Amino acid sequence: MQADPLFTDEIAIDLETNESRIVQKEIYLENVSEWTPENPVLYGIQPMDDLIERFGFREIKVSGKYILLNGRPIRIKGFNRHEDHPMFGCAMPLQAIEQDIQIAMDLGANAIRTSHYPNDELFLDLCDEQGILVWEESHARGLKEYHMQNPYFQKQSEDCIREMVMNHKNHPCIFVWGILNECASETLYGRDCYTKQYRQLEELDRTRPRTSASNKHKNDICLDIPEIVSFNLYPEWYSDQNETAVDCIQDMMQWIRNNPVTRNKPFIVSEIGAGALYGYHTRTKDKWSEEYQCIALEHQLRAVLESAECCGVFIWQLTDVRISRERFENRPRTMNNKGIVDEYRRPKMSYEIVKDIFTSYDDYFETNL
């Protein structure tokens, strides 16, 4: 059923042959319904040429260590997701994208990070419809300082950011913009790049906070710039096996709260996880077994979600994905095998562990702000 329109208007436009024009108009609407994960209300714009652009009304704000969605402190329970499929590669059709979102929702997730590039408009449309929050980020990841010194790097980054924001800013699901995953944020040259790109984001869109997933941890010198602090942490996988997930997470949270630059900012664990080969089982719960992934993920997720000092987590990752053949070391099958489901979307043992943990925590923090 189609509801009565909130607002109608006509704008007369005269165009010459082969001429194109951009038309902008600001309007003020009253008595609108908020877009929330529980009730993702969408409104549409329908020009006479049949282009339909949908949007939603919601407010994203940072207040101290919390991210507020319509005034309520949201707890992020999310996944990192690559656009990759064994049948379709990165050109995934609507049905395959829908399947990924349904898997994430069944697991109890309320957010997805587009690691590490802007995503298909179909994906964002579906997240708008289903009430899934999205961290969308530009296409730059794992770069050393010498990579960032390439004379084409900054312009390409700026072009990507501009296209991402201008094309996708009307999607209410996007709650944060990200840049430069695991890049040279510990160097002065890197800081200059981060500063320029954060400034560009602010100029393009002041309604959303900014962040960057860092693996430089206590050596990062760019944490004063964005509104949200995000770290990629892999306790009980890459790190010293004697360091527990609880020790790692608590140490990082304590450092963040003791650091004058970060103590009053929200903190997100932007990546965490462990690998498992689908169908590989061992009684001794060795690395790469489905049993070990269950143990590591349970330790990691409970360490993060039990703390009110962290406003959320993105598991690395939703599905197993292909990687470069040159990076075969520590990558069986030349795949990143940290998915909760494999590349064919078959669930591993950890599926039920993650689902049980995610669904046991509310989507919002109980706090008086």
Whereabouts are the PLM-identified features?
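Catalytic metal-binding/acid-base residues of hydrolase active sites
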Residues: 117, 139, 180-184, 206, ...
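Secreted/periplasmic carbohydrate-active enzymes, especially glycoside hydrolases
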Residues: 1-134, 160, 166, 173-176, ...
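Substrate-binding clefts and catalytic carboxylate motifs of secreted carbohydrate-active enzymes
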Residues: 173-177, 198-200, 211, 219-226, ...
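Short hydrophobic/aromatic-enriched beta-strand-loop microsegments
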Residues: 131-138, 228-234
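Aromatic- and acidic-residue-enriched segments that line the glycan-binding/catalytic groove
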Residues: 128-133, 147-158, 162, 192-193, ...
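The substrate-binding groove and active-site-proximal loops of carbohydrate-active enzymes
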Residues: 33, 82-95, 103, 107-115, ...
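Ligand-binding grooves and catalytic loops that recognize ribose/phosphate and carbohydrate rings
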Residues: 147-168, 252-258, 262-263, 269
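Short Asp/Glu-rich motifs
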Residues: 86, 123-124, 146-147, 222, ...
